[in-house]
């Protein structure tokens, strides 16, 4: 096998590979000899089939394996001999307009096998000194007021409702049980029908104006509710349209008294109110800590990004941009918006998000090298914990989810990647100065200028929610 490097420009490499016909012939004969004792052909005793006859029967299929193995061997030899770190799998190219002829002649052992191997390699760079980097960690502890607000919400959400006396009118805060059928321009639409639906008036669960028109209704009343779907409604086909709902009221119930006491705590599995307060405070604090971590990580990645400037593999940038851009287009579609609605153009947005893709690739390479240099590993136990956490998100489908990940190495790698990234981030945090800064809740949850979906090297962080206490209530209840 003859391998000649023909191109070495930046991160691109090209090699010309030639396997002479006589070498292919030798490889073919070797393979045929290897299968001689394994095949059974009528008229011949096992192991006594002449190689010439084997060649006549199996020659072309065996040669196909020989050619594939030769291509793989060439790739491995190039990478090993040159000490290359590949960005993506090698690309194999045959001379234009001659590919079929070359392959057919090689299959018949009548010609050389010649092809190009095109590679893209990872850049080499030195890890930067971070001793001069100082970043802020925003700190916020749950206040008694926030804990009490969460308890009040939990008490309200868990309160009981008692039927109002016969003929009583529904008031704001009451729960009504209704059947409804919605129509636009006289035609029913998908998702516009419901039976025995419980609705708390004033909760703003339904579209604006719907609940207000049921205040004063009695059991047995039939009402025509007229509303307009918001212009930014998530179902694009309904956004901005007028609709009418035929509503039948089947029950009216008044809310019971909300008490924050030991009985409330017991409803949430706690021994007493103090234990519930501790659980709520811990859950709210965990939510604040998660948001603080998200911002700390972004500031750290910003600092890292400013420390490095090296060539990026174009193919990796292209892949990353394609993934980011698909998210952008899907988001616009879901919201029924255009680039013009957002005050920009498609071209300007593409330029902006290409820079974001480049940042993500650059930071991904930096974090990978930091992890490799520091010998950071993710154990199988840690991956299993992440897998079981994911499985718990799909009650009733546990076995299907488990089998999916165990039979899909790529999916399992996607569970491992954020674990590795967080370990690397922790390692880097140990190399910089972290200064704690007490802040308000508003400051902690203030949005950054850069889109949240693309702040990190791997974009694994979720967008934070202002309703952190609601999430904390769920955690405390769980």
From Swiss-Prot:
Enzyme class: isomerase
Chief location category: cytoplasm
GO CC field: cytoplasm
Coiled coil: none
Residue stretches making up the PPIase FKBP-type domain: 173-258
Source organism of this protein record: Methylorubrum populi (strain ATCC BAA-705 / NCIMB 13946 / BJ001) (Methylobacterium populi)
Record-listed E.C. numbers: 5.2.1.8
Classification lineage: Bacteria, Pseudomonadati, Pseudomonadota, Alphaproteobacteria, Hyphomicrobiales
Listed name of the protein: Trigger factor
Transmembrane parts of this sequence: none
Free-text note on domains in this protein's UniProt record: Consists of 3 domains; the N-terminus binds the ribosome, the middle domain has PPIase activity, while the C-terminus has intrinsic chaperone activity on its own.
MF GO annotations: peptidyl-prolyl cis-trans isomerase activity; protein folding chaperone; ribosome binding
Keywords: Cell cycle, Cell division, Chaperone, Cytoplasm, Isomerase, Rotamase
Catalytic activity reported: [protein]-peptidylproline (omega=180) = [protein]-peptidylproline (omega=0)
Annotated segments matching region Disordered: 154-173, 444-478
Compartments in which it is found: Cytoplasm
Entry-linked Pfam families: FKBP_C (PF00254), Trigger_C (PF05698), Trigger_N (PF05697)
InterPro entries assigned: PPIase_dom_sf (IPR046357), PPIase_FKBP_dom (IPR001179), Trig_fac (IPR005215), Trigger_fac_C (IPR008880), Trigger_fac_C_sf (IPR037041), Trigger_fac_ribosome-bd_bac (IPR008881), Trigger_fac_ribosome-bd_sf (IPR036611), Trigger_fact/SurA_dom_sf (IPR027304)
Family: Belongs to the FKBP-type PPIase family. Tig subfamily.
GO BP annotations, alphabetical order: 'de novo' cotranslational protein folding; cell division; chaperone-mediated protein folding; protein transport; protein unfolding
Composition-biased stretches (Basic and acidic residues): 154-167
PANTHER family assigned to the protein according to its UniProt record, in alphabetical order: TRIGGER FACTOR CHAPERONE AND PEPTIDYL-PROLYL CIS/TRANS ISOMERASE, TRIGGER FACTOR-LIKE PROTEIN TIG, CHLOROPLASTIC
Role according to the record: Involved in protein export. Acts as a chaperone by maintaining the newly synthesized protein in an open conformation. Functions as a peptidyl-prolyl cis-trans isomerase.
């Amino acid at each position: 096998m003859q391998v000649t490097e023909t191109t070495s420009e930046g991160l691109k490499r090209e090699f010309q590979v030639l396997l002479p016909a006589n070498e292919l012939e030798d490889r073919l004969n070797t393979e045929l000899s290897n299968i001689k004792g394994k095949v059974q052909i009528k008229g011949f005793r096992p192991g006594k089939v002449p190689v010439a006859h084997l060649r006549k029967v199996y020659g072309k299929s065996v040669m196909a394996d020989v050619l594939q193995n030769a291509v793989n061997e060439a790739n491995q030899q190039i990478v090993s001999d040159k000490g290359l770190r590949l960005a993506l799998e090698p690309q194999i190219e045959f001379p234009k307009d001659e590919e079929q002829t070359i392959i057919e002649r090689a299959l018949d052992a009548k010609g050389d096998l010649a092809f190009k191997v095109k590679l893209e390699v990872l850049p080499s760079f030195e890890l930067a000194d971070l001793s001069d980097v100082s970043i802020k960690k925003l700190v916020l502890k749950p206040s008694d007021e926030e804990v009490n607000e969460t308890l009040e919400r939990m008490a309200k959400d868990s309160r009981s409702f008692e039927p109002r006396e016969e003929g009583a009118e529904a008031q704001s805060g009451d729960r009504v049980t209704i059947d409804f059928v919605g129509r636009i321009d006289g035609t029913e639409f998908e998702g516009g029908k419901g039976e025995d639906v419980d609705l708390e008036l004033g909760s703003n669960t339904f579209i604006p104006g719907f609940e207000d028109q049921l205040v004063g209704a009695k059991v047995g009343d039939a009402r025509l509710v007229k509303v307009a779907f918001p212009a930014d409604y998530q179902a694009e086909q309904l956004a901005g349209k007028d609709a009418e709902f035929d509503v039948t009221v089947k029950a009216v119930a008044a809310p019971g008294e909300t008490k924050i006491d030991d009985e409330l705590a017991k409803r949430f599995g706690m021994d007493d109110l103090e234990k519930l307060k501790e659980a709520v405070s811990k859950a709210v604090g965990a939510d604040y800590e998660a948001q603080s971590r998200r911002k700390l990580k972004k500031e750290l990645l910003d600092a890292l990004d400013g420390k490095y400037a090296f060539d990026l593999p174009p193919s990796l940038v292209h892949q990353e941009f394609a993934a980011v851009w698909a998210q952008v287009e899907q988001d616009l579609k879901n919201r029924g918006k255009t680039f013009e609605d957002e005050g920009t153009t498609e071209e300007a947005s593409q330029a902006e998000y290409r820079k974001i893709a480049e940042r993500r690739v650059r930071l991904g390479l930096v974090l990978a090298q930091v992890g490799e240099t520091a010998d950071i590993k993710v154990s199988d136990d840690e991956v299993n914990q992440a897998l079981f956490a994911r499985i718990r998100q799909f009650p009733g489908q546990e076995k299907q989810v488990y089998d999916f990940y165990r039979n899909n190495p790529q999916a399992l790698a996607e569970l491992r990647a954020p674990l590795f990234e967080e370990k690397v981030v922790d390692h880097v945090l140990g190399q910089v100065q972290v200064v704690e800064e007490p802040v308000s809740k508003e400051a902690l949850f203030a949005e950054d200028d850069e889109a949240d979906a693309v702040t990190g090297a791997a974009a694994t962080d979720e967008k934070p929610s202002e309703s952190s206490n609601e999430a904390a209530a769920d955690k405390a209840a769980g």
